[in-house]
Amino acid sequence: MSTQMSVFLSQEPAAPHWGDKALLSFAENGATIHLGDGHDLGAIQRAARQLDGQGIRSILLAGDNWDLESIWAFHQGYRNPKKHGTLEWVALSEQDQAELHARITSTDFTRDIINKTAEEVAPRQLATMAAEFIKSIAPQGTVTARIVKDKDLLSEGWEGIYAVGRGSERTSAMLQLDYNPTGDENAPVFACLVGKGITFDSGGYSLKPSNFMTAMKADMGGSGTITGGLGLAILRGLNKRVKLILCCAENMVSGRALKLGDIITYKNGKTVEIMNTDAEGRLVLADGLIYASEQNPELIIDCATLTGAAKNALGNDYHALMSFDDELSHQALTAANQEKEGLWPLPLADFHRGMLPSNFADLSNISSGDYSPGASTAAAFLSYFVEDYKKGWLHFDCAGTYRKSASDKWAAGATGMGVRTLARFLNEQAAK
């Protein structure tokens, strides 16, 4: 007897005995998702969660009503990091099948690497796994990568990554990956993508409470998301040179760890006083943004699980977007809307740059004053390390990367949200 369940889509309501608001009904031939009027992708994702929650481990999406977007919605809801069920679907056009495969390949990488434990994904492992993923999906010969690690970070001037990670026994690392499909080694760099890669964040000496620390294996979610975004852009045909820079460290407590009052001197000459060791993501990103600026790209994008303030403002369903470039920001928001992903703008203005005073350095790593807008001042801090911060720079504060508990649409863990937005935005900008 087959254990595979067929799942159908219907615009008709369920039979009355299932309840007048029933999303699912069951019969001898399988289950039916009742959408009513329209084609509610959220309802499909919720139904997939219900079926996974019932322990159904093999599903065929059957019937004539399934298309690319509905299959994708079901996949997103059905996927569970604890128990991977098998999912099959009806035949799609060659173009739609290629797109679905590209989405699954890229977002599954993102979700899997974020869900892994900090023991499995130390800083060097994160850099290595990201490079291996991009090499595995890019055309042969288009990707080169180097990983700068340990004391080499100091000799090359990457003081922030080294300082944040020096309290850990696991070596810090910076991935410098070059995707160049042009065949010209002197081709200009179109875009630089910078990811925060804190593989575990204890908070350092500004120690997090235990309940805030439980999800901190996912503090490298910015790196996972931006790597997946580049991967999907490549699978969709990205034809310009892009560099991926991941800033990887583990923020731990030891006799060697970063201390309050320490001062970091960055490669661009800026000095930063450490007033909170739990505001470490911006310290590693600063190195990545300096390196990105050195490449003279048209576009710089950074992704980071940077602040609790963004999550407090937007919850789990949106990433925050901040930029001084209003036109570019609008284009990114449009890309997110087209890809059906949550992205919402938060304010970023010049006065935010003045909210980081230090008595001993150019900047403090946290803002001062009552009711400080934490997400905005974190982005303002980063702006000091982008050469032309007014133009061509976008900052994503990834509030929707990871869920500590399941919801009606998502299993607990990583969501992969943002991968599609980044890919579309990159390819649209590259096509101009």
UniProtKB/Swiss-Prot annotation:
Binds 2 manganese ions per subunit. PROSITE patterns: CYTOSOL_AP (PS00631). Its EC number is 3.4.11.23. Its main location: cytoplasm. The keyword Hydrolase applies. One of its GO terms (molecular function) is metalloaminopeptidase activity. One of its GO terms (biological process) is proteolysis. The keyword Zinc-finger does not apply. Mn(2+) 2 binds at residues 196, 201, 219, 280. InterPro entries: Leucine_aapep/pepB, M17_PepB-like_N, Pept_M17_PepB, Peptidase_M17_C. GO terms for cellular component: cytoplasm. SUPFAM superfamilies: Zn-dependent exopeptidases (SSF53187). Probably plays an important role in intracellular peptide degradation. Belongs to the peptidase M17 family. NCBIfam families: PRK05015.1. Homohexamer. PANTHER family: LEUCINE AMINOPEPTIDASE-RELATED (PTHR11963), PEPTIDASE B (PTHR11963:SF20). This is Peptidase B. It comes from Vibrio campbellii (strain ATCC BAA-1116).
